[in-house]
Amino acid sequence: VESYEYETMYNLESTYWWYRGLHSILLDVLRSLGMDTTSKVLDAGCGTGQNMARISKSITEHVYGLDYSPYGVWLCRERGLPNICVASVNDIPFSSDTFDAAMSIDVLECDEVLEDRALAELRRVVRPCGYVILVVPAYDWLLSEQHHRAVRASRRYSRSRLASLLRKHEIHVVRMTHLFAALLPAVAAYRFALNYMDRSPNDCPRSELKPLPHFINESLFHVVDAERRLLRRMDLPFGSSILAVCRKA
């Protein structure tokens, strides 16, 4: 991720609809898996740390994070998060069988990440019968050149491809569902429009993360929050992201 994207993330992560909605979904997932105040949770690729902050406040203080960006880690520490280190998901600096759950949110698709190595590392640091939680972007046809250059991510996934990768590493899928289903048509239309816009090759690539008017931001959050409640009862067959909840076999 470009360094200026970390600053944007830090400034928006606590209020932006997408982050608020996703982090609320992840809290529901952790609670459904029985995580409590004694649980140890790893956020591998923690960005600027808002997900960690919410887990620490709502579930357990034993939450640890790593990110390959020193600037991202510095911003995490600005949030008051102590258990942070500069490291790659390709080489996680924790002992085997350490965590009750290890999550990696929108990381596997990044260009610097070696899929097989990262999944093997996530499995290694989780305790026997512990959980690996992944969120990845869905559908190759949703690739956006500007956005993915800015976040340095060139992969998107189908459910079958992700499931195959997990089976290869003996990570048992407990649940796999799409996310952001209701907003998929709008996301697709926006991405297609961006891809057809003329851009100078010298333009500094920017992600789609930018402040929105309050009414729009809150409206989008309420759509995602309604979907969060629906996810407590069922899986979604389509959506712009995929959530995989897995158990160490």
Model feature map: region roles:
Residues M9-Y10, I133-R155, R161-S164:
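Short, glycine-/aromatic-enriched active-site segment of Class I SAM-dependent methyltransferases
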Residues D116-Y131:
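A short glycine-rich, Lys/Arg-flanked "PGG" loop and its adjoining helix->strand segment in the class I
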Residues I171-A181:
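Conserved S-adenosyl-L-methionine
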